[in-house]
Swiss-Prot record:
Modification after translation (UniProt): Seems to be post-translationally processed from a 53-55 kDa form to a 45-46 kDa form.
Reported pH dependence: Optimum pH is 7.0.
Family, as annotated: Belongs to the phospholipase D family. Cardiolipin synthase subfamily. ClsA sub-subfamily.
Membrane topology: Multi-pass membrane protein
Record-listed E.C. numbers: 2.7.8.-
Organism the protein comes from: Escherichia coli (strain K12)
Protein name per UniProt: Cardiolipin synthase A
Transmembrane regions listed in the UniProt entry: 3-23, 38-58
Length: 486
């Protein structure tokens, strides 16, 4: 009996170490950033079972077999659609400003199409204005409405948008709504999904959270885009979820969420439509390519307007493109660089690009919320402040609520606005969208918004920062070590 017990014990120990060795080898063999690999190895060797389970659940990018097959199957038809779009040469910009040219060339080479011109843009900073404009556009819709959001929170003006969307569906408008399962959990537990489906709206719960499949698909891979397309002519995107700030997370202690949205008219709506169609097919298996370009885009031709490039990320889209776009924007700056983000946990490359810009004389400012709804990210962000301040970067801490805007402005001419946070999750994992806009007029509008944010912020004093308590420094370094996983 003792011999059997000893044998079982040795086999258990051997299996334990083989499991750790196998996962370690898997981490080392995967192409990933060194800090990320080191963080995972530390977790696994400090808390082996917890670390192994966590790694198998969220350590690798698993879209899931069915979705991965759909992603592969959709590309031949999508590529043909893009080739047809290229034939509409009148909508594509032939040249860009000197500051925007490197970024637009990168996007053209990685995504296969150039930036589109002839768009009209309106920058919107008040949630009421956004929802009122959206309700008007929905009421005037004639053909189709497509929406995707990370969060749809019932209550306030969000309910008015829902009512107008159902009214549109009842009068024959083809309405599709895709919402992230985790972000919109309150919506899917409410009566709204059934009410909408009964009205004729196609409602899809994207990337459903299912603990039974935790090792088959990465559960923290989320649909983080915020997009609206109406009649393939009007489009919205930005940082705002479908929530009324007066009803959203009022008990979080961070104040109302402050967002930015762009309302657009022009061929950019069709460019965004192909992104939506890819997301829809990956999630449902149904193909809904936008109308043929030669029919749909011709009415949009305009002699003037903004030049825009869409940058999409996520499984099935060009890998690392948004990260590359941010690096290119930072290295293109000659006069000033202003970045706004609620969550700041940059890659080493992005941190280096930001600091280098400041060290070569560029006026670099980063605007962050003083209070954050994520304690982990809040502390991890602070770990980068010393290096940024030493390089000459100005850090503004916004005090007027949770600043949720994601924006970058380079030399007053190149603007980036969208859904991308400056953290690892947005840069490497989630489905995201960013608009690159080459236009001085829009840049002036964005600069005015950022100036307003700065007026409601406190500039971080480098001397006072160096005098902060020791326990804060220890906490910052602890969270910094795990920042590649946040």
């Amino acid at each position: 009996m003792t011999t059997v017990y000893t044998l079982v014990s040795w086999l258990a120990i051997l299996g334990y170490w083989l499991l750790i060795a196998g996962v370690t080898l898997r981490i080392l063999m995967k192409r990933r950033a060194v800090p990320s690999a080191m963080a995972w190895l530390l977790i696994i060797y400090i808390l082996p079972l917890v670390g192994i389970i966590a790694y198998l659940a969220v350590g690798e990018l698993h879209l899931g077999k069915r979705r991965a097959e759909r992603a592969r199957a959709m590309w031949p038809s999508t590529a043909k659609w893009l080739n047809d779009l290229k034939a509409c040469k009148h909508i594509f910009a032939e040249e860009n400003s000197s500051v925007a040219a490197p970024l637009f060339k990168l996007c053209e080479r990685r995504q296969g199409i150039a930036g589109v011109k002839g768009n009209q843009l309106q920058l919107m900073t008040e949630s009421d204005d956004v929802m009122q404009a959206l309700i008007r556009d929905i009421q005037l819709a004639r053909h189709n409405i497509e929406m995707v959001f990370y969060i749809w929170q019932p209550g306030g003006m969000a309910d008015q948008v829902a009512e107008s969307l159902m009214a549109a569906a009842r009068r024959g408008i083809h309405c599709r709504l895709m919402l992230d399962s985790a972000g919109s959990v309150a919506f899917f537990r409410s009566p709204w999904p059934e009410l909408m489906r009964n009205a004729g709206i196609e409602v899809v719960e994207a990337l459903k959270v299912n603990l039974m499949r935790v090792f088959l698909r990465r559960m923290d891979l989320r649909q983080h885009r915020k997009m609206i397309m109406i009649d393939n002519y009007i489009a919205y995107t930005g940082s705002m979820n479908m929530v009324d700030p007066r009803y959203f997370k009022q008990d979080a202690g961070v104040g109302q969420w402050i967002d930015l949205m762009a309302r657009m008219e022009g061929p950019i709506a069709t460019a965004m439509g192909i992104i939506y169609s890819c997301d829809w097919e990956i999630e449902t298996g149904k193909r809904i390519l936008p109308p043929p370009p030669d029919v749909n885009i011709m009415p949009f031709e305009q002699a003037s307007g903004h030049t825009i490039h869409t940058i999409a990320s996520g499984p099935g889209f060009p890998e690392d493109l948004i990260h590359q776009a941010l690096l290119t924007a930072a290295y293109s700056a000659r006069e000033y660089l202003i970045m706004t983000t609620p969550y700041f946990v940059p890659s080493d490359d992005l941190l280096h690009a930001i600091c280098t810009a400041a060290q070569r004389g560029v006026d670099v400012s980063i605007i962050l919320p003083r209070k954050n709804d994520s304690m982990l990210v809040g502390w991890a962000s602070r770990a980068f402040f010393t290096e940024l301040l030493a390089a000459g970067v100005k850090i503004y801490q916004f005090e007027g609520g949770l600043l949720h805007t994601k924006s970058v402005l380079v030399d007053g001419e190149l603007s980036l606005v969208g859904t991308v946070n400056l953290d690892m999750r947005s840069l490497w994992l989630n489905f995201e969208i960013t608009l690159a806009i080459d236009d001085k007029g829009f840049g002036a509008d964005l600069a005015a918004v950022q100036d307003d944010y700065i007026s409601r912020s406190r500039l971080l004093d480098a001397r006072l920062w160096l005098k902060r308590p020791l326990w804060q420094r220890v906490a910052e370094r602890l969270f910094y070590f795990f920042s590649p996983l946040l």
